[in-house]
């Protein structure tokens, strides 16, 4: 009978990279610069920024071998790195699409229609939550607060925020991404900059 502990830490086939992960020369320089920000006795605190560097190098996800490499660099057991990577939703342990769509579904966004935004994504990308489209372009994920409540509802696509969304504006963004056309980042309202109050008369 398989032990529970074995089930918990069994590697997923998609994350069993046979290739040994090594930071590129450029990224190793970033790793070293990051480590300088921490006392030698506290370099394990650099786990999150190092995971981010590894994820960007790997195309948006963190292979198992990258977590082993980070554990070696900061001198902690592998499981300590895995605990952090698996706890935070911003870290992906599976490959993702070219465009990673994260729809905020916390209360402010939900009250402003985030459920409808999720449905728009599912319908027009023909994927469900935590799935990637067959063409490899899009991955959809519902997430908790992304910190832009004043501009609800909003989504994050890769590193960009798209705020004050409607079904129509989100659909336009998706269609532009399919065509390789740039989108306006930030508030999708014509006369709103950042989180300034709306002038409602």
Regions found by a protein language model. Give the residues of each.
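Signature of N-terminal electron-transfer/Fe-S-associated modules in redox systems
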Residues: 2-201
């Amino acid at each position: 009978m398989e032990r529970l502990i074995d089930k918990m830490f069994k590697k997923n086939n998609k994350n069993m990279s046979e290739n040994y992960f090594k930071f590129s020369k450029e990224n190793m320089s970033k790793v070293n610069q990051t480590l300088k920000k921490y006392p030698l006795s506290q370099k394990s605190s650099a786990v999150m920024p190092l995971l981010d560097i590894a994820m960007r190098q790997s195309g948006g996800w963190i292979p198992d071998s990258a977590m082993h490499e980070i554990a070696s660099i900061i001198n902690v057991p592998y499981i300590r790195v895995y605990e952090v990577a698996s706890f935070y939703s911003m870290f992906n342990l599976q490959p993702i699409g070219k465009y990673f769509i994260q729809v905020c579904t916390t209360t402010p966004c939900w009250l402003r229609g985030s459920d409808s935004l999720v449905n728009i994504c599912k319908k027009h990308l023909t994927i469900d939550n935590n799935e990637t489209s067959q063409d490899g372009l899009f991955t959809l994920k519902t997430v908790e607060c992304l910190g832009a409540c004043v501009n609800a509802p909003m989504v994050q696509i890769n590193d960009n925020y798209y705020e004050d969304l409607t079904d129509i504006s989100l659909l336009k963004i998706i269609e532009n991404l399919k065509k390789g056309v740039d989108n306006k980042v930030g508030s999708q309202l014509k006369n709103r900059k950042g989180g300034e109050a709306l002038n409602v008369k």
